[in-house]
């Protein structure tokens, strides 16, 4: 079993950019959001159950889950949110475990946006890496890339663990408030560290 680093951070913190950089350096990356997309794309294994639970109105013309419609639905209805999580989370967990077991290399970056809020995921990682950015910067990044209003983005931010909670749980922190070069420099230093930790754990 590989040495597993749980990578997390708030929305707009730069998790994807950091994970891509680790992957570029040769790390194996297992991303729960990417797995969720695969499960809910056209022909994905979760689609029949989603259609049965929520009706065909949340399935787009392509046959994939309409993420915007589903997001609106679960924000408005806590019971719908629980039902969707009860369906998807076990599938995501099982697929994550399979991919981690097969992953090559000295260590795995396991990207879990809600790692701090999920005791099950936390118990399965050897180390917690938090990608950190000030809340104002998170909101601005998400607003620019998604077109959502500031109020909508802040609603998502407020539903996640606080910055203080994430930092308290962190073994390592990447400060992502500057340039991509600054991010790469921090990733490269941690990559060297994780290679050593991974080899020592084998």
Locations of regions flagged by a protein language model:
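ATP-dependent small-molecule kinase phosphotransfer cores
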Residues: 34-107
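Residue-level signal for inorganic ion chemistry
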Residues: 14, 33, 84, 109, ...
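Small-molecule kinase domains that catalyze NTP-dependent phosphoryl transfer to phosphate-bearing small molecules
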Residues: 95, 104, 122-123, 144, ...
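Walker A (P-loop) phosphate-binding motif
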Residues: 1-27, 32-34
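Short, acidic/turn-prone active-site loops that include or flank metal/cofactor-
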Residues: 34-37, 133-136, 155-158, 180
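ATP-dependent NMP and nucleoside kinases share a basic, alpha-helical "lid"
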Residues: 93-102, 107-144
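Well-ordered beta-strand positions
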Residues: 28, 127, 171-172
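An amphipathic alpha-helix signature
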Residues: 47-51, 135-143, 150, 154
